[in-house]
Amino acid sequence: MAMQAHYQAEATEEENFGPQAITRLEQCGINANDVKKLEDAGFHTVEAVAYAPKKELLNIKGISEAKAEKILAEAAKLVPMGFTTATEFHQRRSEIIQIGTGSKELDKLLQGGIETGSITEMFGEFRTGKTQLCHTLAVTCQLPIDRGGGEGKAMYIDTEGTFRPERLLAVAERYGLSGSDVLDNVAYARAFNTDHQTQLLYQASAMMAESRYALLIVDSATALYRTDYSGRGELSARQMHLARFLRMLLRLADEFGVAVVITNQVVAQVDGAAMFAADPKKPIGGNIIAHASTTRLYLRKGRGETRICKIYDSPCLPEAEAMFAINADGVGDAKD
């Protein structure tokens, strides 16, 4: 009897690993029609419901206040959201997968690579390697974990039309992977405006609920905001829209444990302080994007094909720099 209970507990533990399908709520006494309404509104996992504020559920047609409270109460039972000891949290952190960048020096700087379950922002001028790093990561995330990969698919949202599948094939060849398999494992979408960019995240959520993804790339997260909103009069609306987009990205990272990589552009500082600054460029998006990204990397040009990556902001990495190179087969180490 005790053994049976032990196996049941193990099975439950296994089921609780990773995102749980929204249909799980039906077993908790939630009406199937209500579950369907949640799914139609973009909630594909129990985690998505548990992390959502009640106000968001009340916006769904046919969900009353009483229903919303019951749904949230049941979701909270399935998703651990209370306090935990720092020991347990430390244990969970030690199991986080890092995705290799293709450059040993860069991986050493990042203490393993791009962290899953959080947002990494890369910013810099044009030709500093942002898009090339994204292309390399879209392949390395498919590698087995013992080879510095994430054993999952990649999702690529392109806002500037700079995605090139032939770059992925060159990187795949370097790692001895089948080119056609690598391309099949990358879901690509071109975003045409800021609303479309946000809409694509709802589709991303549905796809992640069905298949194992390790990485979500948005290149560039801010380019369309610079054109869709102009002047100071629209600044407040732009920042609110951007904040909502970044919040959705963070929720996807929390919900599915994917690594989210966003690229950002820089703007020249034209105020009085610019003449005293060593480098008068700063990332756009202001404080909103600064607070949303967990790790911020500043990329700049070196000599020839070499580039320099600096940790600009991170909760646990020291401020340091590393050199890498952009080669024909993706990002690699700089040759001395």
From Swiss-Prot:
Q: Would the keyword Cytoplasm turn up in this protein's UniProt record?
A: yes
Q: Name one GO molecular function term.
A: ATP-dependent activity, acting on DNA
Residue ranges annotated as motif Nuclear export signal: 242-257
Please give the chief subcellular localization of this protein: nucleus
Biological processes per GO annotation? chromosome organization involved in meiotic cell cycle; DNA damage response; DNA recombinase assembly; DNA strand invasion; double-strand break repair via homologous recombination; mitotic recombination; mitotic recombination-dependent replication fork processing; reciprocal meiotic recombination
Q: List GO terms (cellular component aspect).
A: chromosome; condensed nuclear chromosome; cytoplasm; nuclear chromosome; nucleus
Cell location: Nucleus; Cytoplasm; Chromosome
Residues reported to bind ATP? G124, E125, F126, R127, T128, G129, K130, T131
Q: What is any Pfam family matched here? A: HHH_5
List the InterPro entries. Answer: AAA+_ATPase, DNA_recomb/repair_Rad51, DNA_recomb/repair_Rad51_C, DNA_recomb/repair_RecA-like, DNA_repair_Rad51/TF_NusA_a-hlx, P-loop_NTPase, RecA_ATP-bd, RecA_monomer-monomer_interface
Establish whether keyword Hydrolase is in the entry: no
What are the protein's UniProt keywords? ATP-binding, Chromosome, Cytoplasm, DNA-binding, Nucleotide-binding, Nucleus
Q: What are the cysteine partners in each disulfide bond?
A: none
UniProt domain HhH: residue ranges: 45-74
- Give the range the annotation lists for the signal sequence: none
Q: Subunit structure, per the record? A: Forms linear homooligomers, giving rise to a RAD51 nucleoprotein filament, which is essential for strand-pairing reactions during DNA recombination.
Query: What does the UniProt record say this protein does?
Result: Plays an important role in homologous strand exchange, a key step in DNA repair through homologous recombination (HR). Binds to single-stranded DNA in an ATP-dependent manner to form nucleoprotein filaments which are essential for the homology search and strand exchange. Catalyzes the recognition of homology and strand exchange between homologous DNA partners to form a joint molecule between a processed DNA break and the repair template. Recruited to resolve stalled replication forks during replication stress. Also involved in interstrand cross-link repair.
| The family this protein is said to belong to | Belongs to the RecA family. RAD51 subfamily.
Name assigned to this protein: DNA repair protein RAD51 homolog B
Q: Which organism is it from?
A: Xenopus laevis (African clawed frog)
Lineage, highest ranks first:
Eukaryota, Metazoa, Chordata, Craniata, Vertebrata
Gene name of the record: rad51-b
